[in-house]
Amino acid sequence: MIKTDILIIGAGPTGLFTVFEAGLLKLKTHLIDALPQPGGQCSEIYPKKPIYDIPAFPEILAGDLVSNLMEQIRPFKPGFTLGERAETLEKLDDGSFIVTTNKGTQHHAPVVAIAGGLGSFEPRKPPIPNIADFEDKGVSYFIKDPEVYRDKKVVIAGGGDSALDWAIYLADVASEVALVHRRAEFRGALDSVERVSELAKLGRIEMITNAEVVGLRGEDNLEQVVIRHKDKARGEEFRDVDDFIPLFGLSPKLGPIGSWGLEIERNAIKVDNSYDYQTNIPGVYAIGDVNTYKGKLKLILSGFHEAAIMCQSAYQRIYPDKKYVLKYTTVGGVEGFDGTKKEAKKEVVQSIGV
């Protein structure tokens, strides 16, 4: 059985940063994730997608953010159970927990932090009868490596941020980019909508609104998409393509976590955000996109903040008789479990009394 101080379910950015905040408090951590590598969606779905709202990083690729977090937490030597899904939660008489995965791996900890992002997730697929026949043969629901689309004819379907952002990005990569949306209005960020409109005027993106992709054609690989216009006079058109990317978001599923007795609201875990992001089960916390409370913002930086607050509460729960005195890392440095220590260089600027 694996024993630790804080058992973190979910190894996305929020889960990884929890390791750092716990490490500053000398708390050991272990992470469980169903994916085969750390990083969550940032690694699995869009490692090459730029992120613009991480403090001090005007722009950083999602995969690079994960790499930086892994380097930041390395001194605290976290444990990982990867490729396994947290299946059951058992509360013991002493208030601690045993979490067992779908492969039977058992973990014991006094504190459990659910940082599973959206939980398990599946792409929302358009109702095209033969779409499964072309998956990985021209149809993709995620963009992991934009270079795959270099000099290709690409059709993107969707009207949200992902569809807009990837249309903008692939305009510099693909030979042709068409963005198909069933409405005339888009639901994404205003600057993204404006940028797509600018690129459309320059002929670098073709915007096809009030239309839907309703069919796919090809022998072994995708060769054409069938686009149906709401304007019956235009009817249907057959467009030659190399790749079709429907981006209709993810369908979040809490999976087995949903049966742990947690208070759930709209497929998210309710927490007490006035104090420490604890759930209705004492000792079980939920941080990051998986939780919900009034005013919740599903941002990576929000997850980082929640992780810091949660770890302070976890420390008091594990050591109720100890009082932790907050020390800034600029003063106390960062002392890892591997014996390393990072600290500011101390220099004498002026001797006292001289």
Curated annotation (Swiss-Prot):
For whether the record's keyword set contains Transport, the answer is no
Q: Return the cofactor note field.
A: Binds 1 FAD per subunit.
Q: Is the keyword NADP in the record?
A: yes
> Which superkingdom?
Bacteria
Q: What is its EC number?
A: 1.18.1.2
Q: What residues does FAD bind to?
A: 14, 33, 41, 46, 86, 121, 289, 330
The cofactors it requires, by name, are:
FAD
Q: Name the family the entry cites.
A: Belongs to the ferredoxin--NADP reductase type 2 family.
Q: Output this protein's name.
A: Ferredoxin--NADP reductase 2
Q: Which organism is it from?
A: Christiangramia forsetii (strain DSM 17595 / CGMCC 1.15422 / KT0803)
